């Protein structure tokens, strides 16, 4: 069986009047994230990881922020498109591991809902999806509550 690993990383700054959407879930918070799309930093990192595993570039290549067609775009639609590209190359998700790096908001109440949506969008068992959160102990931009960073790692396996 052929395996491929992909790593994704994304950062967005807090601001604006959009709702805060993380992993497809609307998370109650004072502000959303500044972005051309809906700003779902979790789904952007995962999309990048999938594209990376497939050697297909990054989300900026597929959904440029210079294209008005993607203004306010639903990142779940973008994620499903990236996953379809992997399926077209006969690869499917083996597992996904996501780390949300944020001082705020607290992620624990939202992790299971995020896992459920990811399992649905990636057509996989929830046991193949892990989402965890950490802080930077008040260090750096995430520690100062200026934004959120996310890392994602995927293992893609050749579909049989």
Swiss-Prot record:
GO molecular function terms noted in the UniProt entry: 2-C-methyl-D-erythritol 2,4-cyclodiphosphate synthase activity; metal ion binding
Query: Which PROSITE patterns does the entry link to?
Result: ISPF (PS01350)
CDD domains on file: MECDP_synthase
Catalysed reaction(s) here are: 4-CDP-2-C-methyl-D-erythritol 2-phosphate = 2-C-methyl-D-erythritol 2,4-cyclic diphosphate + CMP
- Any one of the GO BP annotations: isopentenyl diphosphate biosynthetic process, methylerythritol 4-phosphate pathway
Cofactors (names)? a divalent metal cation
Q: One matching Pfam family, short form?
A: YgbB
Keyword Metal-binding set for record: yes
Where 4-CDP-2-C-methyl-D-erythritol 2-phosphate is bound, by residue? 10-12, 36-37, 58-60, 63-67, 102-108, 134-137, 141, 144
Q: In which pathway does it act?
A: Isoprenoid biosynthesis; isopentenyl diphosphate biosynthesis via DXP pathway; isopentenyl diphosphate from 1-deoxy-D-xylulose 5-phosphate: step 4/6
Cofactor, how bound (note): Binds 1 divalent metal cation per subunit.
Provide the residue positions that the database annotates as binding a divalent metal cation.
10, 12, 44
InterPro entries referenced in this protein's UniProt entry, alphabetically: MECDP_synthase, MECDP_synthase_CS, MECDP_synthase_sf
This entry's Enzyme Commission designation comes to 4.6.1.12
Sorted keywords for this record are:
Isoprene biosynthesis, Lyase, Metal-binding
Query: Site feature Transition state stabilizer: at which residues?
Result: 36, 135
Source taxon at top rank: Bacteria
Family of the protein in this entry? Belongs to the IspF family.
Q: What does this protein do?
A: Involved in the biosynthesis of isopentenyl diphosphate (IPP) and dimethylallyl diphosphate (DMAPP), two major building blocks of isoprenoid compounds. Catalyzes the conversion of 4-diphosphocytidyl-2-C-methyl-D-erythritol 2-phosphate (CDP-ME2P) to 2-C-methyl-D-erythritol 2,4-cyclodiphosphate (ME-CPP) with a corresponding release of cytidine 5-monophosphate (CMP).
What PANTHER family does UniProt report for this protein, alphabetically? 2-C-METHYL-D-ERYTHRITOL 2,4-CYCLODIPHOSPHATE SYNTHASE, CHLOROPLASTIC
Q: How does it assemble?
A: Homotrimer.
- Name the record gives this protein: 2-C-methyl-D-erythritol 2,4-cyclodiphosphate synthase
């Amino acid at each position: 069986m052929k395996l491929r690993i992909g790593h994704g990383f994304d950062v967005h700054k807090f601001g604006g009047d959009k709702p805060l959407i993380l992993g497809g879930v609307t998370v109650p918070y004072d502000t959303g994230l500044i972005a051309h799309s809906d700003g779902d930093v979790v789904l952007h990192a995962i999309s990048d990881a999938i594209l990376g595993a497939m050697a297909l570039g990054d989300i900026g290549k597929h959904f440029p922020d210079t294209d008005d067609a993607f203004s306010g775009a639903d990142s779940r639609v973008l994620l499903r498109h990236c996953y379809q590209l992997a399926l077209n190359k006969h690869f499917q998700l083996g597992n996904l591991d996501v780390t949300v790096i944020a001082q705020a908001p607290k992620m624990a109440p939202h992790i299971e809902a995020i896992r459920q949506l990811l399992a649905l969008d990636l057509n996989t068992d929830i046991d193949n999806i892990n989402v965890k959160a950490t802080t930077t102990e008040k260090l750096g931009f995430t520690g100062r509550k200026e934004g959120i960073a996310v890392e994602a790692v995927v293992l893609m396996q050749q579909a049989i």
